């Protein structure tokens, strides 16, 4: 059986790593999207673990929904990325400062 | 009839003020003069009815302010004190009206002038007839206002503006004291009615007021505040500086304000409050000190003044000092007697000075006059009468009051009366007699008897004044000769009950009878001194012509001459030590540091600066970098959750951090 603490640790560690990956990364927007995916993954992992732990199907349903949402999201995100690349021909995060205050 | 005395001048003022445009000069002159003359006739009648038949008349008109225990009504009290003042005021005022018809005939604003004179008379009448302090204060302030308007009559002149403002503000210093006195009286007596106050005074003789750990006698404190009011209005030493400057107004105004009415208001207040002052030996001592110092100071200062009107103004100041210290000796009736007589001869002096000034084409400097005797013998005669009355020449008006005051001061030579403090007044008063006669005769010599210094062009124009100006002079000179003799027995005759309840003198302060027993040498002393003054003035004028002008013979003498001519530097000292620091305070501290500084900084100006400063910083935070935004979001989320956790532990810490977080979130 999974250790409860261990599993929670893994998911939260994964979440933290993806969080740091989002805002420590200055260069590549693809890394950012990947971290986002990893974040979804950690959350759904957590949900699945909780559903097993609590013996409840709701968590798994949620994680399935999250998978679809993540897929849709990543497709839209990649589409936006492609459009952005067509216009600016670069995907460096640092250079995206047109909306400066 | 009694109310008509008051309201005729008001009517005259309103109609000549508002209707001057339609009535014209001649119409307003006739109407306003008629109003005052009828009023003065009525007040003579009132003097007969109330003074001579020894009754008192109170009129209740309508209630004014009613609020709890505070009740003020429009009430009028006519007793012998009031009617005496009424006769003095209305008589001098109507003569001044008649005089100024001619004196001001070339002035384009004559209706305004008449209106101001009338409103002045009205307020003065309100002051003397009031039966409560509030109404008296109305008259008091109104007189100050009217004096402002009158001194500032030629409003295009800078000097007139300045001296009018000075008169109003210096008076206001005294008025502040008076209003404190009124508040204190209401606090102590729960009433502002004269009748209530005066009947309750003996009860409060042992009342003390603890203020900042000091135990103060309530009656002394009240009378001190009232005396501060009197200092301002009656130009006693300390607040006297407005009086000589108030000569900027037209001469009839000087005659009205500075001879008969306004300056006497302070003395009137002291006399009216005799039942209160009597219970406070301290305040009597203060009255004596201030009065005699004023008398001496002003008499000495008058000696080296070169302005014709200013000499007379200082003489007024000096005589007011006599009246005040006479009040301090508990001789209120003598003080009022001197007030009435002084009104006659001082109005005479002022008006004849006006006549002289009118004749020499508005030259006021005595050094540029001279030998006017040949040209204006009548003015010379009336001025001589006024001067002799002023110095207390025997059998003229001044003799009966002024010499009597000095005689009463000699009482101090009786050591068993325990009134040694009167000797202060005795010495200073007797010395100022000499100076009074000296400057009076110096005035006569410089104006009428010496060789002329006038320019020939204006000497050709010198003329005796017309009938309308002569007539008041003659009436006043008749008054100056006979008034003292005629009303002497009535006012100060031994055992005269003319004053009735209007003046109260403690029996142990009454020294009338003792004054009659003085040795003859002492009684002769003032007369001898004034004769000496005349002789000295003549000697200086005839043999030592250069005494005033080339006084650099000895340095000391020239120093004193300069000092006295500059009025002992009172004005300079006041300007340097009081006026300038206050103005500086007003500008640099109150305006620059407080108003435009601190309040602006913490108010609108500082707030806008604050907001824009922080918005600049917050704008800097929005870099456009997605990673930065993300960082802020995550940071906020984390700290918010930390706070939520901590909020179960400590509430204040929570609130602080909540603001901190929200700030970053924004």
UniProtKB/Swiss-Prot annotation, chain A:
It catalyses: a ubiquinone + NADH + 5 H(+)(in) = a ubiquinol + NAD(+) + 4 H(+)(out). It is found in: Mitochondrion membrane. Its EC number is 7.1.1.2. GO terms for cellular component: mitochondrial membrane; NADH dehydrogenase complex. It holds the Pfam family Oxidored_q2. Keywords: Electron transport, Membrane, Mitochondrion, NAD, Respiratory chain, Translocase, Transmembrane, Transmembrane helix, Transport, Ubiquinone. GO terms for biological process: ATP synthesis coupled electron transport. GO terms for molecular function: NADH dehydrogenase (ubiquinone) activity. InterPro entries: NADH_UbQ_OxRdtase_chain4L/K (IPR001133), NUOK/Mnh_C1-like (IPR039428). It is an enzyme of class 7 (translocase). It comes from the Eukaryota. It is a multi-pass membrane protein. Its main location: mitochondrion. The chain crosses the membrane at residues 5-25, 29-49, 64-84. Core subunit of the mitochondrial membrane respiratory chain NADH dehydrogenase (Complex I) that is believed to belong to the minimal assembly required for catalysis. Complex I functions in the transfer of electrons from NADH to the respiratory chain. The immediate electron acceptor for the enzyme is believed to be ubiquinone. Belongs to the complex I subunit 4L family. This is NADH-ubiquinone oxidoreductase chain 4L. It comes from Chondrus crispus (Carrageen Irish moss). The lineage of its organism: Eukaryota, Rhodophyta, Florideophyceae, Rhodymeniophycidae, Gigartinales.
Curated annotation (Swiss-Prot), chain B:
It catalyses: a ubiquinone + NADH + 5 H(+)(in) = a ubiquinol + NAD(+) + 4 H(+)(out). It is found in: Mitochondrion inner membrane. GO terms for molecular function: NADH dehydrogenase (ubiquinone) activity. Keywords: Electron transport, Membrane, Mitochondrion, Mitochondrion inner membrane, NAD, Respiratory chain, Translocase, Transmembrane, Transmembrane helix, Transport, Ubiquinone. The keyword NAD applies. Its EC number is 7.1.1.2. Belongs to the complex I subunit 5 family. GO terms for cellular component: mitochondrial inner membrane. This is NADH-ubiquinone oxidoreductase chain 5. Core subunit of the mitochondrial membrane respiratory chain NADH dehydrogenase (Complex I) that is believed to belong to the minimal assembly required for catalysis. Complex I functions in the transfer of electrons from NADH to the respiratory chain. The immediate electron acceptor for the enzyme is believed to be ubiquinone. It comes from the Eukaryota. It is a multi-pass membrane protein. The gene is ND5. GO terms for biological process: ATP synthesis coupled electron transport; electron transport coupled proton transport. It comes from Chondrus crispus (Carrageen Irish moss). The chain crosses the membrane at residues 3-23, 31-51, 59-78, 82-101, 119-139, 168-190, 211-231, 251-271, 283-303, 311-333, 337-357, 375-395, 421-441, 467-487, 524-544, 572-594, 629-649. The keyword Methyltransferase does not apply.
